[in-house]
Amino acid sequence: MRRLLSAVLAGCECIARMKSGKRVALRMPRIAFGLLLAGIAQSALAFDLDQLSAQLGKPEVVRGHFIQEKHLRALPQPLTSRGRFVLSRDQGLLWLLERPLQQDYRIDAQGIARRSEQGWQLVVQQSASAQQNRLFLAVLKGDSSGLRQDFELSLSGSAEAWTLDLTPRSVLLKQVFNAIHISGGALVQRIELQETQGDSTVLRLEDSQPGQALSDAERHDFQK
């Protein structure tokens, strides 16, 4: 009796599967078409490195304030500095430190210069420091082609809220950084540099505003 009942149930289940299979078969083309459309839409909406570069490189000038925190293993509290910055797409970067002391810096293709009573003076740098300055400019300007030379890049998010993770590729940078994390929206908002020795630097760019042109004083600083 049990064998007979099992056989009947198995037969019913087989018939049900056949009917269900027909329904599934009829639905499959529609499901596949829907998945195809979803894939096309996702690829069209994907935010990539070229779009990020175009977005960050669009403003001719960006002005704002910065807060820099240097986290050292030997100190319980970070070393904090504050100031203003002016980023020019064509000229470079003015980094105007206001606290805890006042000091103006300029970073451009020639290197880093410090303002003194005699004017702008180039700072003698080792190759590692010079490379870090080039990296800093490339990050703020969104120069992904320049960053690709020295880092593996991983971008996630959207144009309104994105994160770019940099893993050092070159031997020189591997000796300095474990990783660099950059995040932002229309402009760069936060940069975190994780160093190999356990120290880290967090840089927050606040109240950043795009502009059309440099002021006369800013243009003078870049030309001197």
Predicted regions and their residues:
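Bacterial N-terminal signal peptides
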Residues: 32-42
